[in-house]
Amino acid sequence: MRPILIAGNWKMHKTQAEARQFLREFRPALQASSAGVRPQRQIILCVPFTDLAVVVEETRGSGMAVGAQNLHWEDQGAFTGEISGPMLAELGVRYVIVGHSERRQYFGETDETVNRRLAAAQRHGLTPILCVGESLQQREQGLTESWIVGQLDRALPGIDLRNLVIAYEPIWAIGTGKTCAAAEANRVIGLIRQHLGADHLPILYGGSVKASNIDELMAQPQIDGVLVGGASLDPQEFARIVNFQALTPAAAAAP
């Protein structure tokens, strides 16, 4: 059985003081929104580099895991502004996002550098969360499947699929309020799983995930969790997302 992963990507939000305040509010909200953290649901907080040490310390013993949002492919060197795998591992970080569309769009990330970052993460015992997804133009041109397959084929040579998470994030749904229909997200994730031939591989959905759509998303058989952006910044809403109540197939299909 594949694990259920609920990952929050804070992006460039929250100072250390704000991170501590979030956790102070999140823990009781988690208890109040349901019966507490279900043991089969892994919470991952992917926070800015400056918050990593604080969040690792504050969540110690809680069952939550901490993730970074990027890493360099080299272990050390003259790479101003970068962070390496050994630095993250020493802090107690367990996950790292690689290839997010914002990194690709704003910082020139390519499938080649994604591959090198994935290898670096695994080399140091980190579990990478590989982000893939199509633009609105590619979707409208019927290129969704071929584009994503190309991303996977270029990013994954030499990568151990046993220590990997994939997040399907349609670019047109990130931060726009537009959510990919749950059934369509399920279809694309099923295609990813089939292409890789890895039934054990956890595959998440990301793109305007919020409390109002989490139950329907998690009712889909191929979706193993979510990568949450803006909604993960609010402790009450993120607690509700973690404590989703998956709809029955009939309810999920209802208009």
UniProtKB/Swiss-Prot annotation:
E.C. no: 5.3.1.1
Source superkingdom: Bacteria
Pfam families assigned to the protein according to its UniProt record, in alphabetical order: TIM
Catalytic reaction(s) noted: D-glyceraldehyde 3-phosphate = dihydroxyacetone phosphate
Major subcellular site: cytoplasm
GO cellular component: cytosol
Molecular functions per Gene Ontology: triose-phosphate isomerase activity
Keywords assigned: Cytoplasm, Gluconeogenesis, Glycolysis, Isomerase
Stretches of the chain forming a coiled coil according to its record: none
Cited SUPFAM superfamilies: Triosephosphate isomerase (TIM) (SSF51351)
Subcellular location per the Swiss-Prot or TrEMBL entry: Cytoplasm
Entry annotation: catalytic residues: 100, 169
PANTHER family recorded: TRIOSEPHOSPHATE ISOMERASE
Record-stated family: Belongs to the triosephosphate isomerase family.
HAMAP family for the chain: TIM_B
Subunit structure: Homodimer.
Protein name (Swiss-Prot/TrEMBL): Triosephosphate isomerase
Recorded name of the encoding gene: tpiA
